[in-house]
Amino acid sequence: MEHIQKGIAGEQKACAFLEQQGYKIIEKNLRIGKGEIDLIAVHNNCMCFIEVKYRKHNRYGFPEEFVTQKKLLKIQETAEAYIYTVNWQGRIRFDVVAITGEELPVHLMDVTL
C-alpha cells in the first residue's frame, strides 16, 4: 500500500473509531495556508483538532512518537485561523489518534506542547 493510501486508510479508521465514541467529524484534511489538520470533530461541546498517525508496526517506534513539537505548533496555528473563521466560542482541545496495523486506535486527548 502506498504512503498516501496508508494515511487515508488510517484517517478512515480514526474517523470510525471517533464516531463510535460519540464524536461528530466536521472537517477532514483541512488546509489553511501551509497548515493542515487531519480531523476536526466536536465532542461534548468541545472542538477537537486531531492529528492521526498510522504505522504498520512499532518496529521503529509508536505512531504517537512521530508527532513533533513543531507539528503541534503548526496544528495550533492552523486551528487558531479556523476558530476565527467559524467564530467558535467554546472549548478546544488538541488530540492524537495513533494507529498501529490492525490494533485498536490509541486516543491521546488534550495533547500539549
From Swiss-Prot:
**Source organism of the structure:** Cytophaga hutchinsonii (strain ATCC 33406 / DSM 1761 / CIP 103989 / NBRC 15051 / NCIMB 9469 / D465)
Please give the CDD domains that the UniProt record associates with this protein. Answer: PoNe_Nuclease
Q: List the disulfide bonds.
A: none
Domain of life where this protein originates: Bacteria
> What is the name of the protein in this document?
UPF0102 protein CHU_0465
| A Pfam family recorded for this sequence | UPF0102
State the HAMAP family in the record. Answer: UPF0102
Instruction: Output one GO MF annotation.
Output: nucleic acid binding
Return the PANTHER family for the record.
UPF0102 PROTEIN YRAN
- Which family does this protein fall into? Belongs to the UPF0102 family.
Matching InterPro entries, A to Z? Restrct_endonuc-II-like, tRNA_endonuc-like_dom_sf, UPF0102_YraN-like
